Amino acid sequence: GELVLAALDAGARRLVIGLGGSATNDGGAGMLAALGVRFLDARGRPVATTPTGLAHLASLDVGGLDPRLADVEVQAACDVDSPLLGPRGASAVFGPQKGATAQQVMLLDTLLTRLSALSGTRGVALASEPGAGAAGGLGWAILTFLGGRMRSGVDLVIEATGLREALTGATAVLTGEGAADAQTLTGKTAAGVAAAARERGVPVVVFAGRIADDAR
């Protein structure tokens, strides 16, 4: 949220927000708070955008959301298709990676369910969108409150770098991945680069720190 504000202050008209590598699972509440959304308990008092605070959440006040966002194109770069809630959602899939126990995962999913319910019918509907659960639910907040849209992260990078044009006349492409496994094939950079190269019949070599059996 603070980075988005800084970009707005700098006059940015197009924002690309990378989703991944987050240590949070708050449904984007922290970002939204920085952008002017208020999170309130049953008495109308502000609550913290932490699991403890969100446990008391009763309403959202979006009246203070930075109005400049209405004139800015927002894209979310994402390489996962997880929804916000449920067994494939932000809490269940990524919570354990961030240290959450099974009991905490259930609590986090309950909190995100409440958050989406309080956001209105649009927020409830967007909770099932692919990528809504990315970065602890930040994807959902971008879709719901910032009017953003999801884009494949690797597609955005390919466009920005002009990779497809650079492939013309290439004899080979070298790319890399920390761990080449089944997840690599679900939208990771190496898979996207390989797909772009395959369109032009250019062979690809992937360097990886580890190659799992399910990558073959």
Model-flagged regions — what are they?
Residues 1-19, 23-216:
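N-terminal loops that bind phosphate or other acidic moieties
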